[in-house]
Amino acid sequence: MFLSLCLMVLALYLLYKWALPKPISSIPYNPPALQSLFGDIPAMIQGTKANNQTHMDWIIQQMKNHESPIIQLFLSPLQRPTVILADFRETQDIMLRRKDFDRSTNIRGLLEDVIPDHHIYEQTNSVFRTHRKLVQDVMLPSFIQKVAGPAFHSNIMRLVRVWDLKAQIADGSPFLATQDIQGAVLDAVYSFAFGSYYKSSTTLPKIEKLEKWNGNAENSSRNAPQSDKPFDFPDVAFDDLINATIDLAKAPQGLQGSPIAKLQAKVTMNMPHFRRVRKIRDDFLRGSLKSAVSKLPSEGGKSDSQAVTSAVEQMVLRETALAQTENRSPNYFSTMMQGELFGLILGGFDTTSTTTLWGLKFLTDNASVQKRLRQALQSSFTKAKAENRSPTFQELAVARIPYLEAVIEEILRCAGATPALQRLAKVDTQILGYHIPKGTDVLFLTHGPSVWTPGFEIDESRRSQTCQAAGEKKDQCWESHDISKFKPERWLGQKLPSNNREKDTDATETAEEFDGLAGPTLAFGLGTRGCFGRRLGYQQLKTSITILIWNFELLPCPQELSSYRTIEGLTSMPEHSYISLAKVDLTTT
């Protein structure tokens, strides 16, 4: 009996020792993590709560504590450590030139019930390539110019009407912009993805309610504006599809940094509420696909891509063409079709709305930048200014305004909407001279040292051969003294006017030119697995920032409503997104 008890204790002890975290040799780590089955989790929970930080803030602090661009953390029980890298050049090299990393498998567990059968969590294989073929047309410049861009512009113009009314009612008081921006962007992405099949709207009910509110003297007197306090506008009820989409977008909130994120996601998505939400999503997707298929020409007829009015119609045409090429029957209602369609919605909705909200904060808190941007816009769209109207999408699409491009690039750099990229080591490999075993997850920070804060000093000999071979880019870094400042000018260079370049090489007259490669930024990732919607994302930000700054002056908000704390979800959005508006008078500016 005693011997059996001793053997049991010994077995439990050996099991405990086996389960303790095991570090990768030489990479810096937190020694206390090796003494707990939960690794770094307790310290991370305590640190984030005590300092009101996100888990990504805490990770960056660990790198500073170790004074190292690469560390390892134990973020899940019974799992190998996650390696963290904060260096733009090495990240760029891995994303663009090296084949020993691929998409991490972790993201599938977080998103597969939110966005079913989507390419974002597939590894780079034949399945991934099949998915991308299906959606490749919706990111072509022709589709953006004819369908996606105009749809986005029209919905941002509806937002202008909402804010015209709110500015009149609030009379200088701040109000929360989050729902307005998210709603307008959601309407926009649904409009270009589904066209006339999308019957809902978040913005039109607001306009109707605000027009009634604005004309009601009783409401106006009961809610007298107070410039130092936020003005609360009445809520507007949305339909089931809009509510379902918003709920699915919010589902990943709280999972970032969780040691059991995949289990939490699975449990959450199988609760009664989310089963109902998923059914609403799936019913809409199938119904829209059915309607789009019904528009196909009869057998023997030719498809007219010029008549396409939505992404769902474009994808149905693409599936038809792929089926003919592959000598198979088209599968219009596959989970892949549905997943890729809904991915257009969530991807475009969450990233664009979050980045726009950050952009409004930066422009509010940097009045000189806002003023210069408005002047640049008015100087470029002279006809729109003379006619006292907003620029049309057609005018926006062809405009090349260096300062606008610089502002957008700086918003993307500073926002950190996607604060990290995750990859999986496919083979035994190295990063900065450290051994990385096959199967190790690596987190590449996009909003930390070398991008948003000063980088670490790294011996050039520790870099990979491909990184060293690209050494002509090693001076592509931001000045440390203002790297954390919102400064669009960092993206502008000087050029000689084209008519002087050949005629007079000694000419001193110069003009500003946007340089998208001026320094480190990772907002859209890099390489094959970079953001698929990058081209559309730029166009959407160009439209939203232009139209909103054209129509409104963003006034300072009280400090207590202007923090830069973030909420972690699919993206990292600002906790405080308050704005105070004054209408721009084009006749006097």
From Swiss-Prot:
Glycosylated residues (UniProt): 52, 219, 243, 366
Top-level class of the enzyme under EC nomenclature: oxidoreductase
Swiss-Prot/TrEMBL keywords: Glycoprotein, Heme, Iron, Metal-binding, Monooxygenase, Oxidoreductase, Signal
A Gene Ontology molecular function term of the record: iron ion binding
Xref: PROSITE patterns: CYTOCHROME_P450
Cross-referenced InterPro entries: Cyt_P450, Cyt_P450_CS, Cyt_P450_E_grp-IV, Cyt_P450_sf, Cytochrome_P450_monoxygenase
Induction entry: Expression is positively regulated by the trichothecene cluster-specific transcription activator TRI10.
A Pfam family reported for this protein in Swiss-Prot or TrEMBL: p450
Domain of life per record: Eukaryota
EC number: 1.-.-.-
Function: Cytochrome P450 monooxygenase; part of the core gene cluster that mediates the biosynthesis of trichothecenes, a very large family of chemically related bicyclic sesquiterpene compounds acting as mycotoxins, including T2-toxin. The biosynthesis of trichothecenes begins with the cyclization of farnesyl diphosphate to trichodiene and is catalyzed by the trichodiene synthase TRI5. Trichodiene undergoes a series of oxygenations catalyzed by the cytochrome P450 monooxygenase TRI4.
Miscellaneous comment text of the record: Trichothecenes are sesquiterpenoid toxins that act by inhibiting protein biosynthesis.
Protein name stated in the entry: Cytochrome P450 monooxygenase TRI13
Organism: Fusarium sporotrichioides
Lineage: Eukaryota, Fungi, Dikarya, Ascomycota, Pezizomycotina
